[in-house]
Amino acid sequence: MEQQSPVGALLFQIIFLVAIFLMFYFLIIRPQKKERERHRKFLESLKKGDKVITSSGIWGTVVEIGDRTITLKVDANTKITFSKEAIVAYQPGYEKKEEKKD
């Protein structure tokens, strides 16, 4: 039986590790990065009156937007302040009104 040369074995290991890293990058890191960017843009586009859902499942209407917090009106007399990161989506069926550009 022939034995592989040490250089060939080392080259195979390097190629294998690079392939593992590339798979890890394209299957885990890149999709998470895209999702973070999408969520950041979503948070920047929020305005008063938008109907949203929090990560804990609370539905409400945006009444105030701070630097790091958002206050939602969840009932007639109930307002709750959340961290911006807790807002995850618009309510189903809610259509955001686009500002008209003249």
From Swiss-Prot:
Residues that span the membrane, as ranges: 9-29
Record keywords: Cell inner membrane, Cell membrane, Membrane, Protein transport, Translocation, Transmembrane, Transmembrane helix, Transport
Membrane topology: Single-pass membrane protein
Location relative to the cell: Cell inner membrane
Pfam families given in the database record: YajC (PF02699)
Gene Ontology annotations for the cellular component aspect, listed alphabetically: plasma membrane
Protein origin, superkingdom: Bacteria
GO BP annotation list: protein transport
Function: The SecYEG-SecDF-YajC-YidC holo-translocon (HTL) protein secretase/insertase is a supercomplex required for protein secretion, insertion of proteins into membranes, and assembly of membrane protein complexes. While the SecYEG complex is essential for assembly of a number of proteins and complexes, the SecDF-YajC-YidC subcomplex facilitates these functions.
Assembly mode: Part of the SecDF-YidC-YajC translocase complex. The SecDF-YidC-YajC translocase forms a supercomplex with SecYEG, called the holo-translocon (HTL).
Family the entry assigns: Belongs to the YajC family.
Protein name: Sec translocon accessory complex subunit YajC
Protein's organism: Aquifex aeolicus (strain VF5)
